[in-house]
Regions:
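Substrate-binding cleft of carbohydrate-active enzyme catalytic domains
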Residues: 1-123
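A cross-family glycoside hydrolase active-site/sugar-binding cleft signature
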Residues: 3-9, 70-74, 128-130, 145-147, ...
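Generic structural hydrophobic/aromatic packing signal, biased to beta-strands
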Residues: 22, 42, 53, 71, ...
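A generic secondary-structure micro-motif detector
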Residues: 106, 142-143
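Conserved alpha/beta catalytic core and glycan-binding cleft of carbohydrate-active enzymes
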Residues: 124, 129, 134-140, 147-187
Length: 187
């Protein structure tokens, strides 16, 4: 079974380049040719952005028979949301607040994850997200895919969630599979 992944709300430079109105700054944006984490993420304070995500996920649900859809949720800097009037208005509307552990912007991402979980459930699908979705309030039925080690997976299970263990140091096949890099250069 192929489980599709549409990484959101970060890792969206291609979408922002094509649809700059989906971002907090309005662009212009440019697709990167190299790996990286961009401060430019989707503006989740705009209802039009949320509708875009639902439209994309609806199409993904039609294309893939898997009961799961992976929404990513990793590596989403909050710096644009901190200054974005749309995101700040949504934070106020939802009554989100900073606490001792996370910022209101982290809880804004929790809102996005929960909303996407509800949407996917309406299509008969279940949500998977990278272990960053544990930062704040986890969507009630989310499966957590732990890539930054084993701690996230263990935390998810303790919280009653299913977990998929994929710690990058062991399961990323583009990493060296041996400490002997002279004789094992396949990475």
């Amino acid at each position: 079974t192929v489980i599709p992944e549409i990484d959101l709300p970060g890792h969206m430079l291609a979408a922002l380049t094509a649809y700059p109105e989906l971002g907090c700054t309005g662009g212009p944006y440019e697709v990167w040719g190299d790996w990286g984490i961009s401060d430019d993420v989707l503006c989740v304070g705009k209802e039009s952005t949320m509708k875009f995500l639902e439209d994309v996920l609806a199409e993904v649900c039609e294309l893939f028979p898997s009961e799961y859809v992976h929404i990513g949720g990793d590596e989403c800097p909050k710096v644009r949301w901190e200054k974005c009037p749309h995101c700040q208005a949504k934070i106020k509307e939802l009554g989100l607040k900073d606490d001792d552990h996370f910022s209101a912007e982290h809880y804004l991402q929790c809102y996005v994850t929960s909303r996407m979980e509800e949407f996917l459930a309406s299509k008969g699908k279940k949500l998977i997200g990278w272990d960053e979705i544990l930062e704040g309030e986890v969507a009630p039925n989310a499966t957590v895919m732990s890539w930054r080690g084993v701690a996230g997976g263990l935390q998810a299970v303790r919280m009653g969630h299913d977990a998929i263990m994929t710690p990058n140091t062991f399961f990323y096949l583009d990493y060296y599979q041996s400490l002997d890099k002279e004789n094992e250069p396949l990475a």
